[in-house]
């Protein structure tokens, strides 16, 4: 609801909008409620799963974020170069375009409250909460209202090793037909982190729509 006024604040003309992962999930909800604000949606491996996975999840108790693996992420760095050096050879970051990883480490950190170091701009507990609640609100409740032309880009799917395994796609393979996507493409050589691994290819896709 907080984002509903956002498209109008950008000038009022229909937008070509792109979202990745949970960003694409949120974009579908926004576009379903503000269709006139959008000319085209580019949904890159959205965290929109098989409808059956959402059944009964809204009634499931929410575990405390510290019990989630995402809450245990390291959250103290100094300087950003330390973070980049640590991630360069670690999955999934090793497959990212080096420029993207450098930007992530530079702009994904903020000064700590005591000014003695840097911490993640997205607090680990908040990230954990997002994953914990991902199945509690089914996007299939609003997808049938989605009328904006769309392009869907997916990574290969399969049996994932858990909710934080993004070597494979979390996207429901039936999503393209369900929303009437004009293009439904499998980028088989990439993981869930398509924009980070192939920024130039994604940029070219967007440029063709502008």
For each predicted feature, which ranges?
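Active-site loop signature of alpha/beta-hydrolase-fold enzymes
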Residues: 49, 160, 193
């Amino acid at each position: 609801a907080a984002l509903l006024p956002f498209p109008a604040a950008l000038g009022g003309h229909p937008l070509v909008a792109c979202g990745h992962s949970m960003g694409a999930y949120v974009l579908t909800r926004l576009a379903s409620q503000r269709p006139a604000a959008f000319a085209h949606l580019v949904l890159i491996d959205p965290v929109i799963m098989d409808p059956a996975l959402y059944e009964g999840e809204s009634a499931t108790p929410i575990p405390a974020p510290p019990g989630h693996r995402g809450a245990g992420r390291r959250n103290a760095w100094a300087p950003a170069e330390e973070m980049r050096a640590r991630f360069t050879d670690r999955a999934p970051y090793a497959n990212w375009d080096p420029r993207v990883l450098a930007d992530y480490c530079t702009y994904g950190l903020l000064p700590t409250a005591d000014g003695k170091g840097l911490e993640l701009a997205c607090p680990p507990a908040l990230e954990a909460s997002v994953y914990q609640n991902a199945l509690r609100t089914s996007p299939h409740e609003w997808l049938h209202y989605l009328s904006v032309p769309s392009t869907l880009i997916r990574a290969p799917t399969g049996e994932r090793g858990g909710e934080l395994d993004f070597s494979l796609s979390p996207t429901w393979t039936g999503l393209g037909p369900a929303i009437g996507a004009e293009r439904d493409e499998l980028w088989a050589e990439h993981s869930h982190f398509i924009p980070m691994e192939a920024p130039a290819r994604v940029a070219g896709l967007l440029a063709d729509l502008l």
